[in-house]
Amino acid sequence: MSALVNEMPTVNLMQAKNRILANPDIIYFLRGEPGVGKSSLALELQRATGYPLSMMDVPNLDLGDIAMPIIDHENKVTRYYPNARFGIHTGEPVVICLDEFTKGADPVKNMLHPMFEVFMPRLGDLHIHEDSITYLTGNLDTDGVGDGLAQHTRQRIIELIVRKPNSDEWLAWALNNGISPILMAWVDRYPQCLESYLDG
């Protein structure tokens, strides 16, 4: 048995993107320090797939923001309709980023949980298109910003630790994202500005 059972792989943003694109049916949980690009990776995934993007700020969601019960008088049942912001009502693939999932309220996280099922993931009563990409973001425990994840969630996802970009990686990203040339030159001159407390 491996001695590294409890260690998570550490990747850069490009590696995380490539893993997600190569395995769209797996729910990845990207953890890293604040500001490393976990959330903005959603735009890269949207560009790569051409799918619509649904950015969900989980800490600001309440139960009524996820789905609502609707009465079906004809069949004498209730149906659960998800919020249109998730984009799954179109029946087309979508990129869904459950941003800061680990800071959401427990009832909200539990309500989002059916999205992580291996067979027929859904939200409310609607199934998510099989080509859709869903991923979660959160911070490291050492950041001390209130992240928590239940064990039954951990069993359904793959955790990746996303490290901060180095200056070469950041400059390649900045070049394609409209960042000021002055700021790019400064980062090129002072690459230590991207150093992390984890580096020491």
Predicted regions and their residues:
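C-terminal regulatory/interaction module of P-loop NTP-utilizing enzymes
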Residues: 1-200
